[in-house]
Amino acid sequence: MATTTSITTTYAGEKAAGYISAALLSANTIENGGITVKPNVKFKQVIKRLSTTDLIADGSCDFAATDTVTLDEKILQPEEFQVNLNLCKSDFRDDWDAISMGYSAFDNLPPSFQEFLIAEIIAKIADKNEKNIWMGATATFGEFDGLVALATADATVNDVVGTTITAANVIAEMGKVVDAMPSALYGKSDVKLYVAQNVYKAYVRALGGFGANGVGAAGYEAKGNNQAINSLLFDGVEVFLANGLDSNYMYLAESSNIFFGTGLLSDHNEVKVLDMADIDGSQNVRFVMRFTAGVQHGFGSDIVLYTPA
């Protein structure tokens, strides 16, 4: 009988930070710089907002206040979450053996079976976190209010009622979002037009050549459908593929105006892999992760939300 090696491991507090970071910050929107990350929010963080009017006045010998300064705040308060999984080691052994014996296409070998298990689960958490960032609803189990929910509840956000996006109408619909953008934002270096996958695909296809969109039958730069999917622009605005957005949604904002908060160094953080072999003789492994996460925006008036009808 083969010897069973125990893989029970616990990381708590700051020691769990690396794993929590991999799980949360690997989300597409975060990893590609689409949102400002506040990594050490223990409980909540106040986002101060300063607005001014008429800063400059004619010169004079006297000091005279020339401006109205408005200072208010938004609260970024990450919520606590946990992941509890019960896994059978045998379900993962084949994959692990293939990697460790060099029969896999993967180049990065986790240093142990325990690390392999953690990496598998972390990838799933990152996918879920990406969805939560955009479409999460705190009333739903395991979610926090995402950017779309927060924008929907903010009366100052610039709303655009949309439709189902296709390659034939995508340019016109993206144009509606850019047209609704406050003039002060246009030309800012971190302004991004965040789009759902189906919108991004439709835009790439439209660039491939449709008579109605003005790029010609051979498409943009006469490349037809051989269009690059990286570094796309629309009317001078960066187009950002936000995998967490539902189909037909678009969202325009400065990346410095939207925030993701978590407490990477929080004492509440925990990553635990518990091998049940020595406890009940089974081949099960229990995985536990505890962390905090949440999002918030700053100025709603500097955001455009495109919602399908």
Please annotate each region the language model reported.
Residues 56-116:
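Long, hydrophobic/aromatic-enriched structural stretches that serve as scaffold segments
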Residues 80-82, 188-190, 284:
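Extracellular structured ligand-interaction cores
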Residues 89, 151, 197-199, 291:
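Short, flexible loop/turn elements at secondary-structure junctions
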Residues 133-138, 187-196, 216:
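Short coil/turn segments at secondary-structure boundaries
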Residues 172-210:
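Ordered core of a single globular domain
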